[in-house]
Amino acid sequence: MRLWKSMAWGILLWHSQSGALCPAWPPARAAEEIARLQQQLADWNDIYWKQGVSAVDDSVYDQLSARLVQWQRCVGQDVSSTPVSPPLNGTTMHPVAHTGVRKLADRQAVEQWMRGRSELWVQPKVDGVAVTLVYQNGKLARAISRGNGLQGEDWTPKIRLIPSIPQTTQGALANAVLQGEIFLQREGHIQQRMGGMNARSKVAGMLMRQDNASALNSLGIFIWAWPDGPANMPERLSQLAKAGFSLTKKYTLAVKDASEVERARQSWLTSALPFVTDGVVIRMAKEPAAQYWRPGQGDWLAAWKYPPVAQVAQVSAIQFSVGKSGKITVVASLVPVILDDKRVQRVNIGSVKRWEAWDIAPGDQILVSLAGQGIPRLDEVVWRSRERSKPVPPDSHFNSLTCFYASATCQEQFISRLVWLGSRSALGLDGMGEASWRALHQTHRFEHIFSWLALTSAQIANTPGFAKGKSEQIWRQFNLARRQSFTRWIMAMDIPLTQAALQASGDRSWEQLLMRTEQHWRQLPATGERRAGRVIDWRDNPQIKALSRWLSAQHIPGFGS
């Protein structure tokens, strides 16, 4: 199906500012859109942390939060007020601050970060809720949510009810501060196949709700930091394992370079694990003294996250395509996103009716994933722009018997017919894609779908954008097409039959085909009464008759006398 180019309403133009894509909005609209998204994120954040309910998928929340920061930077707005997870209203001080972790974009960034650092280790980035565990005199004294990194909520009563978290410790751990991730225990979780499962929200919900002690049995703990613990990493891991924090030792590997990090990352992505992950964390064994830890200043560790299974993408335009059968399909053009190493710039929405039900306009944020064979798929609309400027769909008068001849209103269906006849299902014109057909039609103003047969080699060579080699190839392809069988030419004319049914009919000429009755067509494979009637309508169509006469004049096999 070809794009209805004239209907491409790209109301959002984009420019680059400090490497980020910025919407070219007037100041008033920019302020309004930012305020609306900021409020929505704040509402979701409040529900999430106060009620333990996730109103939106974790990944969507994270991506929209990043989008908000991007917009704020575009207009020079302070980003300090951006909603964060969790909220800043915890009152219990952390004995050691949570530093957070720097995110690395790709392997090149990992290589750069590792350069000059030694004694490096990699761990899975367990997806859950961060916590501080404080042990005093061999007993769990306090458990504090991450909060803003300096202070958080007192979770001690809940944490005491989680069987997997040791309530007593000995030796160096008898008086220790540990930081880790409370996670949802899984059996054989394969991240690549099963995804994130909204694990973070589920854990938060369990910790926030009251009277759910039995649900806490499904939670586990992964310790990723022991501030002021043993300087030797193997010793640190060994002591944690003896104390009951065995997962840390099992899933902490020494690495020397980015290749080893990548190998571990891929292995944990595709292997069965006891928890959900969203990447890996690389850390130095040598850490500063705990008194120097500050939020946002943990330069001794970094994360390399997995690419999200679905990406939030901004709709830049709504376009309409008309297929050879006349069916109108709506396509959303996107500000490009990367999914599984694939650059996604458009997604098929479906029919006009479906588009209207989705209520998608330029400026909206939609969630896009890859379906079978890497085809982009629209999953949901996650944020709607305040302005709802939508294009008007083309008239719906197109059908399977329209646009064999070119006209202003037939532009897109006509191009679709050219693309079809050049495909391997019809004449097999190698090298003739949509762009080539558009160039030829725009230059030489085809009258009908077979007008290209009358082009000379000089005309093809003079088509803008056609190099000498390409024009010669097209000239050869057009000449070879003249030798194609009658059946293939009929397929190129879009007879409403399968190729198998057409072969079974035994027709080898237009004259034979005209003599066939509806009863004859009904007896062919996969051809019932309805399709047989469509064949008769196709055969009797004035444009089809005119094309058959033109092909006869061109001495195409099966059409001449």
UniProtKB/Swiss-Prot annotation:
**GO aspect biological process, one term:** DNA replication
- Family matches, as InterPro entries: DNA_ligase_AS (IPR018239), DNA_ligase_B (IPR020923), DNA_ligase_CS (IPR033136), DNAligase_adenylation (IPR013839), DNAligase_N (IPR013840), NA-bd_OB-fold (IPR012340), NAD_dep_DNA_ligaseB (IPR050326), NAD_DNA_ligase_OB (IPR004150)
Q: Where are the transmembrane segments?
A: none
- A GO molecular-function annotation: DNA ligase (NAD+) activity
- The EC number of this protein is 6.5.1.2
Sorted alphabetically, the keyword list is:
DNA damage, DNA repair, DNA replication, Ligase, NAD
What top-level class of enzyme does the UniProt entry assign? ligase
Q: What is the reaction catalyzed?
A: NAD(+) + (deoxyribonucleotide)n-3'-hydroxyl + 5'-phospho-(deoxyribonucleotide)m = (deoxyribonucleotide)n+m + AMP + beta-nicotinamide D-nucleotide
* Residue positions of the active site: 125
Question: Which domain of life does the protein's organism represent?
Answer: Bacteria
Q: What does this protein do?
A: Catalyzes the formation of phosphodiester linkages between 5'-phosphoryl and 3'-hydroxyl groups in double-stranded DNA using NAD as a coenzyme and as the energy source for the reaction.
Q: Which NCBIfam families match?
A: PRK08097.1 (NF005987)
Instruction: Tell me its family.
Output: Belongs to the NAD-dependent DNA ligase family. LigB subfamily.
Entry's HAMAP family? DNA_ligase_B
UniProt xrefs under PANTHER family? DNA LIGASE, DNA LIGASE B
Return the protein name.
Answer: DNA ligase B
Organism (species)? Salmonella schwarzengrund (strain CVM19633)
Underlying gene: ligB
